[in-house]
UniProtKB/Swiss-Prot annotation:
This is Undecaprenyl-diphosphatase. It comes from Mycolicibacterium gilvum (strain PYR-GCK) (Mycobacterium gilvum (strain PYR-GCK)). It is a multi-pass membrane protein. It is an enzyme of class 3 (hydrolase). It is found in: Cell membrane. Belongs to the UppP family. InterPro entries: UppP.
């Protein structure tokens, strides 16, 4: 892997991780279109450590408040606060992707990164996002969340294991279908992703140096620089996206996903780009 590839893919990871456009799908597409080789699931997972560190810093006060309330409720007595229960909902919601990610890790690293699948998922899931935006009541608040919401959003997060779907797109859509407003759905989805993505990145760290199957390999310094770039760009992206959701819908991203997916399908059909 060249330094140009590291910089381009890391910036792309930071820009797209929190938007409902699929960062892993973008990395798979960009690496094949411009560099004629897949970045690999392991490099992608390690690169995501930078963007998840960004969301960890951005939500530091929220996380500290939730942890404080969770431990206080766990070992104390009296009425439990909404933050106490939110801590439990994050834990419960992390279980589905932890189990499914381990069971299907080999498929995720290899077959799931086929560009035919990525482009198709990009287009098909666009209609799910549009339906969620159209049907969502957007009236429920954080204190109204239950363990059922956590389980449903947790299983929605599992869809992001398929490049082209989008973790934020899946969790925000699930939240909208459950009646959450856009900002709550995004915040809850981002909190839910932190433990899962950190675990995935650390687990994939050894494989990033020697990818399983096809994929570029990266050196230690390249992985470090990649993580730092993804952190800086990702922090700016999450701050912008949460402000965007307050005033705007996700229909903007639906159109973008359909156009990008269609372009990739055309490139694949004409033989300009290889699927694997």
């Amino acid at each position: 892997m060249s330094w140009l590839q590291v910089v381009v893919l890391s910036v792309l990871q930071g820009l797209t991780e929190f938007l409902p456009v699929s960062s892993s799908g973008h990395l798979a597409i960009a690496s094949r279109v411009f560099f004629e080789d897949d970045a690999g699931a392991s490099f992608t997972a390690v690169c995501q450590l930078g963007t998840e560190a960004a969301v960890l810093v951005y939500f530091a006060r929220d996380i500290a408040r939730i942890l404080k309330a969770w431990f206080a409720g766990l070992f104390g007595s009296g009425e439990r606060s909404p933050d106490y229960w939110l801590g439990w909902w994050v834990i419960i919601g992390t279980i589905p992707i932890s189990v499914i990610g381990l069971l299907f890790k080999d498929e995720i690293r290899t077959g799931a990164r086929n560009l035919w699948l990525v482009a198709t998922a990009m287009i098909v899931f666009s209609f799910v996002i549009a339906a969620a935006e159209y049907a969502g009541r957007q009236t429920r608040r954080v204190e109204q969340l239950t363990w059922r919401d956590s389980v449903i959003v947790g299983f929605a997060q599992c869809l992001a294991l398929v490049p082209g779907v989008s973790r934020s797109g899946a969790t925000i859509s699930a939240g909208l279908f459950l009646g959450m407003d856009r900002e709550l759905a995004a915040r809850f989805g981002f909190l839910l992703a932190i433990p899962a993505v950190f675990a995935s990145g650390l687990f994939s760290l050894p494989d990033a140096f020697a990818p399983v199957g096809e994929g570029m390999s990266a050196t230690g310094p390249q992985l470090l620089v990649s993580t730092v770039i993804a952190f800086v760009v990702g922090y700016a992206a999450v701050a912008w996206f949460l402000r965007f959701l307050v005033r705007h819908s996700m229909y903007w991203f639906v159109g973008y996903r359909i156009i990008l997916g269609s372009v990739v399908l055309i490139l694949l059909s004409t033989g300009v780009v290889a699927a694997i």
